[in-house]
């Protein structure tokens, strides 16, 4: 009789448990993590498609966030504030990390207390909002006939939540995605108070996934596969040796998941882990659009000590076929004067002289002679290029490999003789009736021996003829394309542009 009672007791107890499922949520880790700055703004709106762990970096409090939730991040004084229906504040910022291995989760119709046991009068361990979730473990019906769910919180605690305010969902999202603006990204994010009054948004992900969002933005996916693979190797080496990364040309153009292409993804996967090394150590590599027929020595364009970079030397680019190989831009004297800090209204440009000290003729300084005296500007390739503003092409000259042809189209009679100069705009002239006037129009009428001719008062009389587009250090993208089309393999392409190196995992 006693045996029968005991068996009946255990049978009744087992009926209380409706479902039991083993589960173990884990934050996704990356073998080669990188962080890419996506934004630095007063506020950012971010949508999370997938399950993410949300951590306050100030106090290490953690929670799981509801899939497809939108968070709004902003600054309040020294703090980062994140609003997801509920507000969170931290002076250190927040981390949002991908979570693996959650098959089912509990979400809530309103704020719900997590209890120590399956009873409403038991200890409250936490309270979760509608924006938060917990990992589902199992369910039971208590002695009052109430259904409760056993759940696991992000901080590792287990507890019970009532079915009356809880819904159990299957996790159907295989690839968690972060959306910022119109672009989507793999991985997680950091929301940091790095800049005063702004929230810095970093995308944290694995290096190989990062490259999938770089290559199609740096090289057309339609180009030869060996060129794409060379680009993947060089981009990987650059990123692996960079202290910080941005999603612009300041580092490498990174468009995220929304810009990935099957062809460039294959190039990344087929070169996985391969980098450029010198003396057995990975090096930081560089690339650009067009060399113009020869790449540059790093010491000729970045004022670096060439002896420290024996792999960043000038090499021929025999198969480069680019629309940017040769170019020409013309400028007015007023444009040049403004770039050098002079007022064209009261300063006359007399001459412009480039100093080409690079092995191929790269210009490292420019001197102008003016009525206010001479001025020389010396600097690396970006300093020189920005002296000559142009439409498009990032707003400045394509490279610092150029020559200058200056045509002084005016001969002006002064009290001291004749001067040859580029322009007469803003200058005083003596008229036939003996009065003096200032030239203010864009054109001037000039009496010649045979007729009156009209000329621009400030013509585009200074012409720069140059080659290449970019800093020209390391790999030319158009050059890599040409080599690939002529039978070169990716590793040999990379070794061509980075002399004295090995290319391997």
Where are these regions (language model features)?
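Conserved, single-site charged/polar hotspot
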Residues: 1-505
């Amino acid at each position: 009789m006693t045996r029968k009672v005991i068996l009946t007791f255990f049978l009744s107890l087992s009926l209380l448990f409706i479902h039991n499922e083993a589960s173990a949520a884990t934050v996704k880790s990356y073998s080669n993590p990188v962080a890419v700055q996506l934004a630095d703004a007063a506020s950012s709106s971010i949508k999370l498609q997938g399950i993410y762990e949300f951590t306050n970096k100030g106090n290490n409090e953690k929670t799981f966030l509801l899939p497809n939730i939108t968070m709004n991040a902003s600054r309040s004084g020294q703090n980062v504030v994140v609003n997801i229906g509920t507000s969170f504040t931290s002076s250190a910022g927040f981390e949002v990390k991908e979570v693996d291995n959650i098959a089912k989760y509990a979400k809530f119709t309103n704020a719900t207390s997590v209890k120590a046991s399956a009873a409403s009068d038991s200890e409250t361990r936490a309270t979760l909002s509608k924006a938060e979730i917990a990992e589902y473990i199992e369910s039971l019906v208590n002695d009052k006939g109430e259904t409760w769910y056993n759940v696991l919180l992000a901080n590792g605690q287990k507890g019970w939540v009532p079915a009356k305010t809880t819904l159990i969902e299957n996790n159907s999202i295989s690839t968690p995605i972060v959306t910022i603006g119109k672009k989507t990204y793999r991985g997680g994010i950091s929301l940091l108070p790095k800049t005063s009054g702004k929230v810095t948004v970093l995308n944290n992900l694995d290096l190989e996934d990062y490259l999938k969002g770089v290559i199609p933005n740096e090289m057309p996916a339609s180009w030869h596969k060996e060129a794409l693979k060379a680009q993947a190797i060089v981009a990987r080496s650059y990123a692996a040796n960079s202290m910080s990364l941005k999603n612009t040309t300041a580092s490498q153009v990174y468009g995220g998941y929304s810009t990935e292409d099957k062809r460039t993804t294959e190039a990344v996967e087929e070169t996985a882990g391969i980098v450029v090394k010198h003396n057995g150590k990975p090096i930081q590599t560089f690339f650009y659009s067009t060399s113009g027929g020869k790449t540059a020595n790093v010491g000729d364009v970045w004022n670096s000590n060439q002896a420290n970079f024996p792999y960043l030397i000038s090499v021929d680019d025999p198969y480069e076929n680019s629309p940017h190989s040769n170019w020409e831009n013309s400028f007015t004297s007023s444009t040049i004067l403004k770039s050098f800090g002079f007022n064209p209204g009261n300063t006359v440009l007399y001459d412009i002289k480039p100093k080409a000290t690079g092995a191929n003729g790269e210009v490292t300084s420019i001197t102008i002679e003016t009525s206010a005296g001479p001025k020389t500007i010396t600097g690396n390739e970006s300093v020189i290029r920005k002296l000559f503003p142009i439409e498009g092409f990032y707003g400045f000259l394509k490279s610092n490999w150029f020559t200058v042809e200056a045509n002084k189209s005016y001969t002006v009679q002064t009290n001291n003789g004749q001067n040859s100069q580029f322009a007469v705009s803003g200058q005083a002239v003596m008229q036939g009736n003996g009065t003096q006037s200032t030239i203010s129009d864009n054109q001037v009428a000039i009496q010649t021996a045979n007729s009156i001719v009209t000329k621009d008062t400030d013509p585009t009389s200074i012409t720069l003829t140059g080659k290449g587009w970019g800093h020209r250090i390391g790999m030319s993208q158009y050059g890599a394309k040409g080599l690939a089309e002529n039978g070169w393999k990716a590793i040999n392409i990379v070794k061509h542009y980075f002399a004295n190196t090995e290319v391997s995992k």
